[in-house]
């Protein structure tokens, strides 16, 4: 095989890899807790794993809480582990209306100036001063994935969600690159319902960098 044939073959393989389906993760409402807040809500009860998640080292815990806002409450909101340095609550726009909380659209971890909420566990209550957000839709990927897809950490891209009979394109999808991440797009339940993505065959494909 000469150089030109090799380059043609490599280009074809890379193009096929760029068109491969991106696994879709639908994020239901959930919480992340720091160690101090966890110990207050679940004293003498070590965090326990219920289900492993796709991202390495992350899991859904057995522990759940009730969120209480000015207008309503949401029960059985699952804790995701492991514990973090700062507590955070991720909900959908629909959830925010149910609670009566003006949760801003933010990237995970960006909680400055965000509203709080009351957390109730089977053992205690805690008034979280801040940390309630609607999570910005995003794609997790490794540096190799980013190289293949021609994107960088912090980029905004357009992604097509291929669900049932509907196909919906989401703009402003944030790219998050880390050696510890696996390729997966995260959307919330409102976005999943709009795209008809509530079936196991649903997947995402990159449309174009923005």
UniProtKB/Swiss-Prot annotation:
Entry keyword set: Acyltransferase, Bacterial microcompartment, Metal-binding, Transferase, Zinc
Binding positions for phosphate per the UniProt entry: 84
Pathway(s) this gene product operates in, as recorded in its UniProt entry: Polyol metabolism; 1,2-propanediol degradation
One Pfam family matching this protein: PTAC
A GO cellular-component term linked to this record: bacterial microcompartment
Note accompanying the cofactor annotation: There are 2 Zn(2+) ions per monomer; Zn(2+) and CoA bind inbetween the 2 domains in each monomer.
Binding site for Zn(2+) 1: 30, 32, 90
Sites where the protein binds CoA: 26-28, 71, 78, 193
Binding site for Zn(2+) 2: 138, 140, 186
Top-level class of the enzyme under EC nomenclature: transferase
NCBIfam families: PRK15070.1
Name this protein carries in UniProt: Phosphate propanoyltransferase
Organism per entry: Citrobacter freundii
Highest classification ranks of the organism: Bacteria, Pseudomonadati, Pseudomonadota, Gammaproteobacteria, Enterobacterales
């Amino acid at each position: 095989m000469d150089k030109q044939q090799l380059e043609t073959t490599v280009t074809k393989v890379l193009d096929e890899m760029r068109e491969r389906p991106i696994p879709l993760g639908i994020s239901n409402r959930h919480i992340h807790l720091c160690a101090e807040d966890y110990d207050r809500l679940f004293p003498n009860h070590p965090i326990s794993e219920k289900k492993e998640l796709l991202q390495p080292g992350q899991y859904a815990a057995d522990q759940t809480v009730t969120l209480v806002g000015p207008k309503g409450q949401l029960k059985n909101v699952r804790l995701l582990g492991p514990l973090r340095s700062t507590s955070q609550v991720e909900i959908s726009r629909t959830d925010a209306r149910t609670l009566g909380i003006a949760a801003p659209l933010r990237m995970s971890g960006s909680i400055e100036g965000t509203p709080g909420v009351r957390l109730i566990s089977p053992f205690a209550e805690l008034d979280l001063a801040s940390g309630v957000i609607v999570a910005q839709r995003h794609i997790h990927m490794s540096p190799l994935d980013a190289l293949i897809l021609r994107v960088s950490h912090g980029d905004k891209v357009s992604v097509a969600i291929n669900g049932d009979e509907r196909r919906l394109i989401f703009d402003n999808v944030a790219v998050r690159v880390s050696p510890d991440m696996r390729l997966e797009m995260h959307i919330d339940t409102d976005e999943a319902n709009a795209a008809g993505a509530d079936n196991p065959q649903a997947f995402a494909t990159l449309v174009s960098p923005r």
